Amino acid sequence: TPLVTLAHQDDRYYVNYTEDVLAAAKKCRHPLIIFTDYNELRNGKTVTTNRLLKVKRLLLTPLKLTCFWKNRFVRRRILSIGSAICCPAVTLVKENLDSFSFKNNMKSNIDWQAWEEISRRKGEFAYTARAGMEHRIHQESTTSELIEENGRRAEDLYMFRKFWPGWVAKMIEKVYQKSEESNEV
């Protein structure tokens, strides 16, 4: 199959997910990834908005305009502030990602690292602002475990250093660390 979605077994996909991904793909010449907005699933309840979702949606605002989908500068600025793209909401376009593979050097930020690498390529990051799925937030997740053990800080700092000088990366990481509180169930 030319399109691959990294679905998690405990996430829920809405009926519009496939429609929205295919509609966005039709607007592209060379799509790299296609992704939708998402909601959270906490304790069996759908959460459509909270502080973290608001920040992520704000970061992704430029990508509501198709003219920015192929703009590497815009994509990289979005990623330089944090991981606003929800991994299970992403569909990869395999034929446009030759020689790409996820690296196995992190526990939590594997996806952010992947988007950073892909953001350097020519092509589009196609985004639809309609929620296409629900991402389950739970205490047993790798992200929650790493936050509890403070293991995620090193990974976040590593990622910020891909975009910023060390001292700026440290400042952003301190602010970013506060957002981790929203991963608590």
What is each of the regions a protein language model found here?
Residues 4:
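Short aromatic/hydrophobic "clamp" motif used to bind/position activated sugar donors
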Residues 8-12, 37:
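The conserved acidic donor/metal-binding loop of glycosyltransferases
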Residues 16-55:
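Conserved donor NDP-sugar-binding/catalytic core segment of glycosyltransferases
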